[in-house]
Amino acid sequence: MPATHPTRWGTKAASLYDKGYAARYRSHDDGLAGTAAYDGFVAWLQEVCGRCAAPFDALDLGCGTGRYFCALRGVRALVAIDASEAMLAQARHPLHQDQVTVAAVTMVHGDLMSHEFAAGQFDLVYSIGVLAEHVPLQPPLVARVQRWLRPGGRFAFSTVHPDSRSIPQTPARRLGSSIAPWLPGPLRRHLRDRVLAGGLYADEDRVRELFASGWAIESLVRLESEAHLHCLCVARKAIV
């Protein structure tokens, strides 16, 4: 399926992850296998799958090379979207391909910020290493995912925490983080948005804000990878 209405985020990803980069990225997958961080993400996604009534339908937002396809359990049909055709080509031969149990995988070349799926199409939408990292996690995207989920469906995703060692803790950032809670509403929100880089980082408080209405947060934990400190969230769409 062709990409539709690319945003600047999708265009940037498609440009960055060209054929050469995608091949190197896929080679990096092989080196990640067995590391504590990778195993932590796999165990988390498997646990999320265990909460869903099998068989169920899933969407991978920003699937990349299909690094986590092997973690899925009980999935009847998987849709995997990415803005890079080169990454999708690599995802056809993902890490631990012999462990992938999903019978039907549909690859979609598209921008997750603008591509549309049917309302109520999925029981699980998941995204690892994309949201609040390469793509801003903001209310419009949360609303899109909510629309795509069936009642009671789950949205499982990682973010980069603003306290991650990978983020330079400049004096301005430290000052902004310390004074933001004491400022009046509009100014506090503006400064918080600056600290969170317009949605490219998200801490527990920001996740709770985004999922305060129409969702129930089932779990919200931290995980340290080789690159970042992450939040791992599972939010469930309201049944009624």
Which residue stretches match the model-derived regions?
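Conserved class I S-adenosyl-L-methionine
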Residues: 1-52, 156-182
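Core SAM-dependent methyltransferase catalytic element
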Residues: 215-240
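Short glycine-dipeptide loop
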Residues: 149-155
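Class I SAM-dependent methyltransferase SAM/SAH-binding core
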Residues: 59, 65-114
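A short, conserved alpha-helix within the catalytic core of class I
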Residues: 133-144
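A conserved beta-strand element that flanks and buttresses the S-adenosyl-L-methionine
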Residues: 126
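Short alpha-helix
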Residues: 196-214
